[in-house]
Regions:
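Short strand-turn segments of transmembrane beta-barrel domains in outer membranes
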Residues: 26, 34-36, 46, 51-81, ...
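Acidic/polar loop-and-plug regions of large Gram-negative outer-membrane beta-barrel proteins
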Residues: 119, 127-186, 207-251
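Outer-membrane beta-barrel channels and translocator barrels
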Residues: 83-86, 121-125, 190-192
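Residues on the lipid-exposed face of transmembrane beta-strands in outer-membrane beta-barrel proteins
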Residues: 75-81, 116-120, 181-187, 197
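Short acidic/polar hinge/loop motifs at secondary-structure boundaries
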Residues: 4-31, 52
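Structural signature of outer-membrane beta-barrel domains
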Residues: 4, 67-69, 97-101, 135-140, ...
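Residues that define the transmembrane beta-barrel architecture of outer-membrane proteins
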Residues: 41-43, 65-66, 71-75, 108-112, ...
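Transmembrane beta-strands of outer-membrane beta-barrel proteins
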Residues: 58-62, 88-92, 128-130, 195-199
Length: 251
């Protein structure tokens, strides 16, 4: 196998699989530093995902699901030929997840995912395989807010969106796409010896938008200076309230 952990964080980015559950079911999970037949163990555990087309049973599966979470609808289809008489095996899977607005205000979701795998059993000792997958995704984010904001606006409040020309627009939009290609050559030397050679290509693309307000007041509605607690607890804020109250009484 080939290690596809992120080079910066040291972890695997599962969002790159993009909801392709049926395509990545064939896996082995090893906990801790226990010895694994496919890699050295690690403190966080080790997972090996088998993408060879011969690992999938022949058949077709399609499903549609509805949700009220990050996305509203999910459609997926998977087809596998199994190992055919000519020594070839093919598997393909596709998924689409979408939401005009999720359960959190101002969050949309649009994600596609694809998986293609081909394998050729040359003879009893040699086989070659090629697999590719990716999940181009565009989604908007929600923010973590304080209990004070939740008390005023509810648990689904999200300060990252607003109206522009009468339409909802999010200031935090994520675009991600991690296309990956994996090629393998298996050589059975003897009944007890196997040589496995792999080649992998992985390209990571991740971008995130945000409001720019350099040298200007923070425009976020949940900015702490805009909350009642700041006016009540801050010394200058309390002084301002007292002055305002006095002027109001004088009028």
């Amino acid at each position: 196998g080939i290690n596809f952990n992120d080079q910066e964080r040291g972890r695997f980015n599962y969002s790159s699989l993009g909801g392709l559950n049926d395509a990545f079911r064939n896996k082995d999970v090893i906990n801790g530093i226990e010895n694994a037949p496919f890699a050295f163990g690690s403190l966080g555990g080790t997972t090996n995902i088998n993408t060879r087309a011969t690992a999938f049973a022949a058949g077709t599966k399609a499903s549609v699901a509805y949700s009220n979470r990050s996305y509203n609808m999910r459609a997926t289809a998977t087809h596998s030929t199994g190992l055919m008489n000519n020594g070839w095996a093919f598997t393909g899977s596709a998924v689409w997840r979408w939401a005009k607005e999720g359960i959190i205000e101002g969050t949309f979701y649009n994600s596609w995912g694809y998986f293609l795998s081909a394998e050729k059993m040359i003879n009893d000792r040699h086989s070659i395989s090629l697999a590719t997958y990716g999940a181009p995704t565009k989604r908007s984010q929600s923010a973590a807010v304080t209990q004070e904001v939740y008390d005023f606006r509810g648990i689904y409040y999200n300060p990252y969106w607003g109206y522009q020309n009468g339409k909802k627009r999010s200031s935090r939009v994520v675009n991600s796409f991690d296309p990956t290609v994996v090629a393998n050559w298996d050589f059975k030397i003897t009944d007890k010896q196997n040589l496995k050679t792999g080649f992998g290509f992985h390209y990571s693309n991740y971008s995130n938008t945000a409001l720019g307000f350099y040298n200007a007041a923070d425009p976020r509605p949940d900015y702490y200076r805009n909350l009642p607690s700041y006016q009540i607890n801050d010394v200058l804020g309390s002084y301002g309230l007292e002055c305002t109250t006095e002027i109001h009484h004088e009028n």
